[in-house]
Amino acid sequence: MRLFLSLPVLVVVLSIVLEGPAPAQGTPDVSSALDKLKEFGNTLEDKARELISRIKQNELSAKMREWFSETFQKVKEKLKIDS
């Protein structure tokens, strides 16, 4: 029974796929595709800049940078003394 029902469904799906795009769905012109790509790039850039600024302004990241700087200075001083 399943095979009996699935074969007509398969034929309908294949006919729709093989029919091709409708005239209104024809290939879009290159300029609109480039405009969409440019818009996507701009929004991605804006989001990345916002994320970086949020990370820089975050209190935890500021404390981590400060701790890393202090630790690095201590290591540098120890290496200068030992050398």
Swiss-Prot record:
Q: Which UniProt keywords apply?
A: Lipid transport, Secreted, Signal, Transport
Database matches in Pfam families: ApoC-I (PF04691)
Might you name a Gene Ontology BP term for this protein?
negative regulation of cholesterol transport
What GO MF terms are annotated?
fatty acid binding; phospholipase inhibitor activity
Supply one GO CC term from the record.
Answer: high-density lipoprotein particle
Quote the subcellular location field of this record: Secreted
Family assignment? Belongs to the apolipoprotein C1 family.
The record's listing under PANTHER family reads: APOLIPOPROTEIN C-I (PTHR16565:SF2)
Instruction: Describe its function.
Output: Inhibitor of lipoprotein binding to the low density lipoprotein (LDL) receptor, LDL receptor-related protein, and very low density lipoprotein (VLDL) receptor. Associates with high density lipoproteins (HDL) and the triacylglycerol-rich lipoproteins in the plasma and makes up about 10% of the protein of the VLDL and 2% of that of HDL. Appears to interfere directly with fatty acid uptake and is also the major plasma inhibitor of cholesteryl ester transfer protein (CETP). Binds free fatty acids and reduces their intracellular esterification.
Q: What else is known?
A: Apolipoprotein C-I is present in acidic (APOC1A) and basic (APOC1B) forms in P.paniscus, P.abelii and P.troglodytes and perhaps also in baboons and macaques. The two genes for ApoC-I arose through a duplication process that occurred after the divergence of New World monkeys from the human lineage. In human, the acidic form has become a pseudogene sometime between the divergence of bonobos and chimpanzees from the human lineage and the appearance of the Denisovans. Pseudogenization resulted when the codon for the penultimate amino acid in the signal sequence was changed to a stop codon.
- Tell me the protein's name: Apolipoprotein C-I, basic form
What species is this protein from?
Answer: Pan troglodytes
Q: Supply the source organism's classification.
A: Eukaryota, Metazoa, Chordata, Craniata, Vertebrata
